[in-house]
Amino acid sequence: MTLSPTTADKFTFGLWTVGWTGADPFGVATRAALDPVEAVHKLSELGAYGITFHDNDLVPFDAPASERELILKNFRAALADTGLKVPMVTTNLFSHPVFKDGGFTSNDRSVRRFALSKVLRNIDLAAELGAETFVMWGGREGSEYDGSKDLAAALDRMKEGVDTAAGYIKDKGYNLRIALEPKPNEPRGDIFLPTVGHGLAFIAQLEHGDIVGLNPETGHEQMAGLNFTHGIAQALWAGKLFHIDLNGQRGIKYDQDLVFGHGDLTSAFFTVDLLENGFPGGGPKYDGPRHFDYKPSRTDGYDGVWESAKANMAMYLLLKERALAFRADPEVQEALAASGVFELGEPTLNAGETTADLLADAASFEDFDADKAAERSFAFVRLNQLAIEHLLNAR
């Protein structure tokens, strides 16, 4: 397979990624600001499918209407010239000081009303640009001090905000779905809806949960010490993997936003294996964009920025090649069977069997030899060794 990306790969980048100037809490920018039009053209040249943005990545927070219209006109022209898509749009409810205590969950009601109005206006923009997903990351929705929030009220306000936005989408007839992006902390000490599991539980309480799903990010789940592949698998199983953010992370620390695969490489391999091959026994598959949410190293100039963009796509394609070979290997299929992976796909109860039938089945309890069953070797290490050998292109 070719390692040159094409639009068929559906690789997308946030404007805030390649446009990150390198400013962080400890230092100022190391690169000049990037013109969004240049970003569109350069990403198109590199083989990307699309570009995404927060509203204020594209249009400054306090831009007058005339400036906003000019920026959008130039951006739309660049999209038309290149054919680059805008599959996802999101709203910045975290940078301006007005959002220091959150947007949807601020203790200040006037701020909540402003935040919700800002979101609704950007839903309109997302629809105008043909986006199919509207991501909500509540970076400031949380606290540092447990006594500073009525937690039930905060969740009520979060529900109110998401349901209002989802209801607006339905009322307008937009072809849009909302994807919530979990993160455990940073910038807040503790962020509401910190993991995929929290997000799924929250969605179950929504009035319009049918069009609300998740946008899990590699580093965010790994910051919480969780298995990213398990997280996206559960979201996919629940029919709620609406979007995905790929990057690299090395352990439980700050959000590193490394190039995809430059952190936990084995985890990245199994993530791509799931995205490209699906579950071993079949079931739902992800068909959305492969979105890179990372930060180019602040040690590099813009030559390094574009190299890092290419690196994300190359890493994914390399891992895709290895994952396809892994699943196609007859020895791997034999190892999967020997380890009972396919057996797990068989229902525990027989067709039509009741609990009374199960309790009456002596073979399942009275005559079951637990000691004998405990002797089974599942050979999981052998299976994983095969995966690593494929990952290293040693097979």
Curated annotation (Swiss-Prot):
Instruction: Detail which positions bind Mg(2+) 1.
Output: 181, 217, 245, 293
**Which cofactor does the UniProt annotation name?**
Mg(2+)
Q: Which residues are noted in the entry as Mg(2+) 2-binding?
A: 217, 220, 255, 257
Top-rank taxon of the source lineage equals Bacteria
Its EC number is: 5.3.1.5
Q: Which reaction does it catalyse?
A: alpha-D-xylose = alpha-D-xylulofuranose
Where in or outside the cell it occurs: the entry states: Cytoplasm
The UniProt entry annotates the active site at 54, 57
Quaternary structure and interacting proteins, as annotated: Homotetramer.
- What is the designated name of this protein? Xylose isomerase
